[in-house]
C-alpha cells in the first residue's frame, strides 16, 4: 500500500514539475514585433522589415472566430445572428428558409444609422422599454 502511495506521489510530482518547466502557451502563439533595422539599412533590409511588419500587423488584426473574450457581449441573439429581424430578400438556403444579414449591412432593408440606434436594445429584448 505504501509503495502505491509513493508511486502516485512521484507521478503527481513529476507531472507538476513537467508542467512548470514548459514555456507559457500564450508566449508561443503571440508573434514578436519585427526589429527596426535602423536608419542606415539597405533597401533589401528595409523591404524585409516591411514584409515582416506587414505579416506582424496581419497576425494581430486577423479575425479570430470564437477566440474572443465575450464578457461584454451576448452569447445569444447578437446583432447579425440568424435570429435577428433583418431577412435577406430573395436569398434562401438549402432548406428553403430565409438567410439573415448582419445589422447595418449594405444589403439590408434598413439603413446602417438606424441599427446604431436600435440594434442593441432589439438584440437584448429591451426594445420600447421591454424586459
Swiss-Prot record:
GO cellular component: extracellular space
Domain of life, source organism: Eukaryota
Single GO term (MF): neuropeptide Y receptor binding
Protein name as it appears in the record: Pancreatic polypeptide prohormone
Pfam families xrefs: Hormone_3 (PF00159)
Any one Gene Ontology BP term: neuropeptide signaling pathway
Signal peptide positions (record): 1-29
Subcellular location: Secreted
